Amino acid sequence: MPDSEPLEPLNQESSSNTEQLKLSTTPNIPARPQTRPQKQTTTTTTVPTDQDSTTETSLEKPLDNPQDELDELAHEIEKVLSDPVIPPRPEHGSSTKSSETQTEHKEQDFEPAHPAIPQRPTNKKETIQSEVSDHKNGLESKFDLKVNEETPADSVSTDKDKVHIKPSIPTIPSRPQSRNLDSSEVDNTKPSTTASIPARPQRQSTSTQDEYKPQASNTPDIPTRPQTKTEKSVSSEELDKPGDEPSSKDQDNERYTDDSNASKSILETEKAVAQEEKKAKKSDVDNKPSEPTTSTDSSTEPAAPARGFRLPLHMQQGSGPISTSTPVAGSEAELNSLNNSNTFGDGEVTPGNSDTKATFKNDEDVENENRTDSSSFDDDMETISQDNEDGEQDRRNRQETATEENAQESEAPQFETTIIESGETEERDGDDTDSGELYSEQQQNKEKEKIVPATSTPKIPQRPPKKSSLSRATTNDSLTSLDSTSKPPKPVIPKRPTTEESLSNIEPTIPSRPATKKITSVGESQHEPIVPNRPDNKDLESSQRDTQASVKSKPPPPKPKKLSSKIAAFQQQLFNPANASSKEDVSSTGSKQPESGIRKRSTENSVLSRFGGKAIPLPGMFNPNQMPKPSISHGEETSDDREEKQESATANAPVRRTRGPRGKKLPKAVADAEVKTESRFAIESGKLWSIEFKKKIVEEKEITSTSVEDLEKPKILSENDEAGDEGKETAVENEVIDNPEIPVKDELQHDVVDVVGHPEKDVVTGLDDDDEDVPPEVNERFIKDEEISNVGVERTIASETTTEKHSTDEEEVEEEAVVDSVDIPIRRVAVNIVDSTEVQKDVEDEP
């Protein structure tokens, strides 16, 4: 059980206290923790369970007299505190509870001796009480160890308490016993704040004692807390309560100074301040005690930078001791400043922002008109110069804000001295709260003075040059305000006490962010504060601009490359041929006028060249209007000569290889390919025809005539009366074919073979060659054979002729002509079918 652990140190407490606890087991006290003990931070007892409530009543009986005193103090505090302040606090509770829990862990290390504060949250929520009770038990154990040193004899009596008071009980009695020990000495705990003051600096963590003194002295600080809840209420209440407002205003003004410290200090201070405010209200005003936030001062110490921001050195040095005991008033002022940073600071900044924005636009327009150059190089130089100026201006801003805060603090040193005399812990608390109040009052007066003459407050120009969001400026103001509250102001005061200097110092810091152009324009538009503040920056800017303008004046547009002479001439001819021709003529004539001899030759040649030859033309051969003037002719001739020269030069110039893609070579088959042109027609030579000359045989006519005469035998024709003139040839053929069965057949066949072996000879050479082909011996044989065997053939041939001669003599003449015509086919048939020798024999025999 967590409650069992604190029992052992509690047993070591004085026996007199334990006896009193035994006597007072169930008195009327349980009603008190509901109403008053919540306010009586020292005497209130936590009731984590129902058993605890019974034990608390037993513990509180011996404390009746000190409780009455505490009740009186609580009534006085309630009178001082305004009732409306209390309700807004619970509204804040949702956000602050989380922060309070964070601070409780930090506070436990510093709060060994005062268990009364953790008792407060018991009335609000038992769930929270259970969580807090564990932390409280740890605190009580630490507290009891110190008590044991003071009263070792009391340890024996607490052993009996173990029997009566079981695990949860010892936490409750331990706290009132420690207070009873103080009360036995001289009721020091009962006005818990007054008597326990010396113990605090030793233990460095009991905000309860510190809370009462600043509350009695700084009663107006308490109502300032609700002001932070709503920005509207803050603005109205600040006007009514000047003491509280300046703390917020001063802190707001101080917050603008340090940008690096802004986010870190704001988060930490907001948590710490919210916790401290709740502590003060719970202990003093609220009937609804919150979780124990005994010493929020530990939380106010500069924690490790949450967002990489670093507190200034004076903040870090002063925050160590001050953080342990920051009073309620200081926390309230810080909360007001933090919450009001958005409202009050923005109220001051926004009108200036509107003015500055307008002025910047006007200045930019003027500068743009004056400055035609818009080169990227100028922009780069400007950004570099801006960065350098921004760093310097940030330093100046920090120094100026510090000096302003110091000057304000120097004006009201009385409050600081009184607080310092009260004690080390109170000095730290008073510096935070009272100094903030004094600053707020002084700044209200100063701001009223500033608003009338200077239209632009020093804060206004800071943002507009970069046109950064208002939230950033407000955060800067809050940071500077927090820094100023924690600073030891005395050594800084003599540096720059006057408000005018502070304003002038603040104003130049503002233009540092914008570009150099904008800064100068702002200075020109707002001459009064800015001009004296930054002569160096302006001189540097002006010198830089002059150098940039001289060096960086816009270069003339790049000249186009000269076209080649041919291209230029061609373009001139296209666009303005008349001007081009006249210019060429003028140039040619002007350059060559002194050479009179050359010109004469050229004119003569040009005139003569107009005609077919170079002779003098006759009159009327040409139109005199067409004759060119001598100068023009000279120019044209010279231009022609130029063209000829150029053409000759180009012709003689080596032909350049056409540039193709490099590194790619054609394959050898393609590169070395040879194209051969072959005609489609094949030429063939040969003898188309030949001529042979031979003697004509005149005997043929005689043969035909004789053959017709010899063949006049009508016998065969009588049998073949059917054949007409047309059928003579057919009859002859049939007869010749019908009679192959002659006994001389073998010889005839032999002859036929011979004849067939040489048929072409008969065709080509003609029928006249039969005499040559057939030997005389064969002819004689055939004559004999005809007489013997071939009588029928002769008869047939003779019959053809005889039938014709039966007609008249005229018909005989015609028949002779017909036979002449029929002679050739008869011989042809003989050659093809029958041995031609037979016919030849007949022919030879007949003459």
Curated annotation (Swiss-Prot):
UniProt feature, compositional bias: Polar residues: 11-28, 174-183, 189-227, 316-328, 570-594
Subcellular location: Cytoplasm, Cytoskeleton, Actin patch
Comp. bias intervals (Low complexity): 31-57, 290-306, 474-486
Any one of the GO CC terms: actin cortical patch
Keywords: Cytoplasm, Cytoskeleton
Pfam families linked: Aim21 (PF11489)
InterPro entries: Aim21
Compositionally biased spans, kind Basic and acidic residues: 72-81, 102-112, 123-149, 228-258, 267-289, 358-372, 535-544, 634-647
Keyword presence, Nuclease: no
Annotated Acidic residues bias: 376-392, 423-435, 809-818
Bias (Basic residues): 656-667
Top-rank taxon, per record: Eukaryota
Region (Disordered): 1-675, 704-740, 799-818
TM segment ranges: none
Role this protein plays: Involved in mitochondrial migration along actin filaments.
Family in the record: Belongs to the AIM21 family.
Record protein name field: Altered inheritance of mitochondria protein 21
Annotated organism of origin: Candida albicans (strain WO-1)
Organismal lineage: Eukaryota, Fungi, Dikarya, Ascomycota, Saccharomycotina
